[in-house]
């Protein structure tokens, strides 16, 4: 192969002259020529369009929108639930207020004729204020429960226990009960006094029946 790159020697030159290399032969016998990078590739001959070349990721196909889109419920319809609505608090409040106010008003009625009219009128005005605040939702649950206990003690003539509940309400809930609790306190005192008088009258009525007349012996 080396002989291909060497020109034939000059006959006129000496035997020891260096050979002359032929660069033209090197370029002619070199490897296959490369296509320049700037040269465009010819379009295909069949005429079919070429797909555009993209360097990004392939597009993602989105599913078509569902035809059964959620729609709001029609007007006037409510979702069906298995929970029953709670009982009306108004009815429960009216029941409790009658359980408390009715015994107090009855106790005030018992005091008429034994208590001064001015005192009875003041107690009646305080009880009316209690009813108004109770019905208007201005009293808390603890106050209502303690008033129910106070009435029970009053009905059983447990005056000291009723008075203790009255004092606890004045200490713990003075802002709620201060306007009408004075009348309840006075009613407890008047009812206690009336009960003591009735007890004395009963005792005075029973004692003469048990007394014996001197010198008179009751038949056995």
From Swiss-Prot:
SRA1 RNA exists in a ribonucleoprotein complex containing NCOA1. The RNA also forms a complex with PUS1 and RARG in the nucleus. Interacts with AR. It holds the Pfam family SRA1. Belongs to the SRA1 family. The keyword Protein biosynthesis does not apply. Residues 1-89, 194-220 are annotated as: Disordered. The modification Phosphoserine is found at residue 48. GO terms for molecular function: transcription coactivator activity. It is found in: Nucleus; Cytoplasm. Residues 55-76 have a biased composition (Pro residues). Residues 194-206 have a biased composition (Basic and acidic residues). Residues 208-220 have a biased composition (Polar residues). Gene3D superfamilies: Functional domain of the splicing factor Prp18. Functional RNA which acts as a transcriptional coactivator that selectively enhances steroid receptor-mediated transactivation ligand-independently through a mechanism involving the modulating N-terminal domain (AF-1) of steroid receptors. Also mediates transcriptional coactivation of steroid receptors ligand-dependently through the steroid-binding domain (AF-2). Enhances cellular proliferation and differentiation and promotes apoptosis in vivo. May play a role in tumorigenesis. InterPro entries: SRA1/Sec31, Steroid_recept_RNA_1. It comes from Mus musculus. One of its GO terms (cellular component) is cytoplasm. This is Steroid receptor RNA activator 1. Appears to be the first example of a new class of functional RNAs also able to encode a protein. Keywords: Activator, Apoptosis, Cytoplasm, Nucleus, Phosphoprotein, Receptor, Ribonucleoprotein, Transcription, Transcription regulation. GO terms for biological process: apoptotic process; negative regulation of myoblast differentiation; regulation of transcription by RNA polymerase II.
């Amino acid at each position: 192969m080396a002989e291909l790159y060497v020109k034939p020697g000059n006959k006129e030159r000496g035997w020891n002259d260096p050979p002359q290399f032929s660069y033209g032969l090197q370029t002619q016998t070199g490897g296959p020529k490369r296509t320049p990078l700037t040269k465009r590739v010819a379009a295909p001959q069949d005429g079919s369009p070429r797909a555009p070349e993209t360097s990004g990721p392939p597009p993602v196909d989105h599913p078509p929108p569902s035809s059964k889109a959620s729609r709001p419920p029609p007007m006037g319809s409510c979702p069906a639930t298995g929970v029953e609505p709670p009982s009306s608090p108004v009815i429960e409040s009216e029941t409790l207020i009658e359980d408390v106010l009715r015994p107090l008003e009855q106790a005030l009625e018992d005091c008429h004729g034994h208590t001064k009219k001015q005192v009875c009128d003041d107690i009646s005005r305080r009880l009316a204020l209690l009813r108004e605040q109770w019905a208007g939702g201005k009293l808390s649950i603890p106050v209502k429960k303690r008033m129910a206990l106070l009435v029970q003690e009053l009905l059983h003539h447990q005056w000291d226990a009723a008075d203790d509940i009255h004092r606890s309400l004045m200490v713990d809930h003075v802002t709620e009960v201060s306007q009408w609790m004075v009348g309840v306190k006075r009613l407890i005192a008047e009812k206690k006094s009336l009960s003591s008088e009735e007890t004395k009258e009963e005792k005075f009525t029973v004692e003469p029946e048990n007394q014996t007349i001197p010198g008179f012996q009751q038949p056995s």
